[in-house]
């Protein structure tokens, strides 16, 4: 039943100074851009490269390799700032990925097989061919452990690239690339879980299963308290870390367990609120009480929003504009001292460049074209073949997850890790520039539906 709203006098909000609003306007306009997160990510990557090759290069390593120690109940753990970002904060990135995957599968573009089949097939091509190309260059060498690096598509960069040519691509193509990147994320998560662990420890994994049971109960009973999920997520991170599975994947699991249904059926809530509003309009009240009633209605309307959507909205901005750019800043700084163009022709960077720039576009385009020819699916948004080819090239921008996998593949081999980062940066840059050029100058403008 509806509760009586508070009748305390509402406090007026202090006016915002005009000068302050004017100063904030460009910042607010930037963050409203669809490509804003991709632009910020690129700026951080460039800043890291400039920093690592400047007279202050030593401070780059000093900052991100600085050690810190935390303790709780007599238990202490030490790690570097970079490890804290990569293994700690990036858990929140994977948490958002997990929630977005669940949202798309439950109520989004991937909720039916007919909608999901084409991006799924395209993603398979975009993972198989790049991995095979990399393996062809590095089979039998110490670098073969990095075979999964060119499998990833960076959704922020790739969608940001499409927004720069939005008059040339239909909304259906943007949805297609987004769904493809989501399946790429799923594939990358499975690869990390299966191939980049550190040796399984059954006792800790049993503990992780216990935490999963708790999460299942929280989901079943539609618990909306964020603290409960945070505590369960922390316990899952700890048990997976000691169990030999990369701990950041706990974020994906936690995201998949977030309730995707509203607490109560929407019709019931709206009926109650309609009756409440009718009674309120028939009663004379002052403006302060009216304001309190409106706040009460807002609180009741929150019951219509599933916890999954609420947490996606809560964490999207800090992850997209804080954690991921910080990850790029901490992991993109490559010293080019003593390097030449010949270094790009080494098997490791060449394998990554070939995988991202050649393997991605060949795999995605051929698998997509084959599916269309066989009648398995329809063209997304009535796209032309040149448009599909351009999107396939853009999907070769494999930045965030590719850097993450590189760190897992070469944790104790800094020279190989540097070569991998160089290959990722060059391959992603080639894919972005060529993909943009194809969509801007070759593909015909999108035809409005």
Curated annotation (Swiss-Prot):
Pfam entry (one): Na_H_antiport_1
Q: Which PANTHER family match?
A: NA(+)_H(+) ANTIPORTER NHAA, SODIUM ION/PROTON ANTIPORTER NHAA-RELATED
Bilayer-crossing residues are: 38-58, 79-99, 117-137, 145-165, 175-195, 198-218, 240-260, 311-331, 347-367, 390-410, 422-442
What are the leading ranks of the lineage?
A: Bacteria, Pseudomonadati, Myxococcota, Myxococcia, Myxococcales
Gene Ontology biological process terms, A to Z = regulation of pH
The source organism is Myxococcus xanthus (strain DK1622)
Q: Which family does it belong to?
A: Belongs to the NhaA Na(+)/H(+) (TC 2.A.33) antiporter family.
A single Gene Ontology MF term assigned here is: sodium:proton antiporter activity
Q: Keyword Endoplasmic reticulum, does the record have it?
A: no
Say what the protein does. Na(+)/H(+) antiporter that extrudes sodium in exchange for external protons.
**Subcellular localization:** Cell inner membrane
> Which InterPro entries does the UniProt entry name for this protein?
Na/H_antiporter_dom_sf, NhaA
GO CC term, one of those recorded: plasma membrane
Any S-S bridges, and between which cysteines? none
| Full protein name | Na(+)/H(+) antiporter NhaA 1
Per the record, membrane topology reads: Multi-pass membrane protein
Q: Which UniProt keywords apply?
A: Antiport, Cell inner membrane, Cell membrane, Ion transport, Membrane, Sodium, Sodium transport, Transmembrane, Transmembrane helix, Transport
Question: What residue range is the signal peptide?
Answer: none
């Amino acid at each position: 039943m509806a509760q009586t709203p508070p009748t305390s006098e509402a406090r007026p909000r202090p006016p915002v100074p005009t000068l302050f609003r004017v100063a904030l306007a460009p910042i607010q306009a930037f963050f409203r851009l669809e490509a804003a997160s991709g632009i910020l990510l690129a700026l951080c990557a460039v800043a890291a490269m400039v920093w690592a090759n400047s007279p202050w290069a030593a401070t780059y390593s000093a900052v991100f390799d600085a050690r810190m120690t935390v303790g709780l109940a007599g238990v202490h753990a030490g790690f570097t700032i970079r490890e804290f970002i990569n293994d700690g904060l990036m858990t929140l990135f994977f948490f958002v990925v997990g929630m977005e995957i669940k949202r798309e599968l439950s109520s989004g573009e991937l909720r039916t097989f007919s909608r999901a089949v084409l991006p799924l097939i395209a993603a398979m091509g975009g993972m198989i061919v790049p991995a095979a190309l990399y393996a062809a260059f590095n089979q039998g060498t110490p670098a073969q452990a990095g075979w999964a690096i060119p499998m990833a598509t960076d959704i922020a960069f790739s969608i940001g690239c499409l927004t720069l040519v939005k008059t040339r691509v239909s909304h259906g193509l943007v949805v297609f690339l987004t769904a493809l990147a989501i399946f790429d994320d799923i594939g990358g998560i499975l690869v990390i879980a299966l191939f980049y662990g550190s040796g399984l420890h059954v006792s800790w994994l049993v503990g992780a299963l216990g935490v999963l049971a708790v999460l299942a109960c929280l989901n079943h009973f539609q618990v909306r308290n964020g603290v409960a999920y945070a505590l369960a997520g922390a316990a899952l991170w700890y048990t997976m870390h000691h169990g030999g599975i990369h701990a950041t994947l706990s974020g994906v699991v936690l995201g998949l367990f977030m309730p995707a249904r509203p607490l109560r059926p929407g019709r019931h809530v709206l009926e109650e609120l309609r009756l409440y509003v009718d009674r309120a309009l028939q009663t004379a009240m002052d403006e302060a009480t009216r304001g309190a009633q409106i706040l009460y209605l807002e609180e009741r309307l929150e019951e219509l929003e599933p916890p999954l959507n609420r947490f996606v909205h809560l964490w999207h901005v800090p992850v997209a504009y804080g954690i991921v750019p910080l990850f790029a800043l901490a992991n993109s700084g490559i010293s080019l001292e003593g390097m030449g163009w010949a270094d790009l022709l080494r098997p490791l960077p060449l394998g990554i460049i070939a995988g991202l720039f050649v393997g991605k576009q060949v795999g995605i385009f051929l698998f997509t074209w084959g599916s269309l020819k066989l009648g398995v699916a329809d063209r997304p948004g009535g796209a032309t073949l040149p448009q599909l080819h351009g999107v396939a090239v853009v999907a070769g921008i494999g930045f965030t997850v590719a850097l993450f996998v590189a760190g897992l593949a070469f944790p104790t081999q800094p020279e190989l890790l540097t070569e991998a980062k160089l290959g990722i940066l060059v391959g992603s840059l080639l894919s972005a520039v060529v993909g943009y050029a194809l969509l801007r100058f070759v593909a015909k403008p999108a035809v409005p539906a």
